[in-house]
C-alpha cells in the first residue's frame, strides 16, 4: 500500500492531502499513454486500461474538462490488432539483421576491453620505472 501511495504522489494531478486525482482530459488521449505507465495506480477507478478513452462525469459537475476520483476513464495507446502488427513488424524487420548486429556489438566490446587493458599496462610500467 505504501508503494502504491508513493507511486500516486509522483503522478501529476494527485493531491496527497485529499487523496484525489484531478487529471485534464487531454492527458487521456491515444498519443499520451506514456503518462500512465503504472496501471496499479488506477485500481480504485471503475475501469483502467482498455482500448478506447471514455469519460463520465457527475451530473452536478459544471466543469467536465477534469477527471475526478471515481470517474470512469480508460487509457489507450493502440488497439490489440495494431499492437500485434507493430510487434510482428518489429521482429520481421530485425530478423535478417539480428545476428549480424549482435556480432558487431560483441566485437566492439572486445576492442574496448583490449584498449583498456593496454592503458592499464602502460600505467603499471610507468609506476615500475
Curated annotation (Swiss-Prot):
It comes from the Viruses. Residues 84-129 are annotated as: Disordered. Residues 84-98 have a biased composition (Basic residues). Residues 99-115 have a biased composition (Basic and acidic residues). This is Uncharacterized protein R547. The lineage of its organism: Viruses, Varidnaviria, Bamfordvirae, Nucleocytoviricota, Megaviricetes.
Amino acid at each position: 500500500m505504501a508503494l502504491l501511495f508513493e507511486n500516486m504522489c509522483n503522478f501529476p494531478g494527485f493531491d496527497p492531502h485529499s487523496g484525489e486525482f484531478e487529471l485534464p482530459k487531454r492527458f487521456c488521449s491515444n498519443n499520451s499513454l506514456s503518462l500512465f505507465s503504472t496501471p496499479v495506480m488506477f485500481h480504485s477507478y471503475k475501469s483502467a486500461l482498455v482500448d478506447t478513452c471514455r469519460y463520465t462525469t457527475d451530473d452536478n459537475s459544471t466543469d467536465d474538462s477534469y477527471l475526478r476520483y471515481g470517474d470512469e476513464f480508460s487509457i489507450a495507446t493502440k488497439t490489440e490488432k495494431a499492437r500485434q502488427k507493430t510487434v510482428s513488424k518489429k521482429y520481421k524487420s530485425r530478423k535478417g539483421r539480428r545476428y549480424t548486429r549482435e556480432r558487431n556489438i560483441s566485437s566492439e566490446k572486445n576492442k574496448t576491453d583490449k584498449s583498456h587493458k593496454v592503458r592499464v599496462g602502460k600505467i603499471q610500467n610507468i609506476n615500475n620505472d
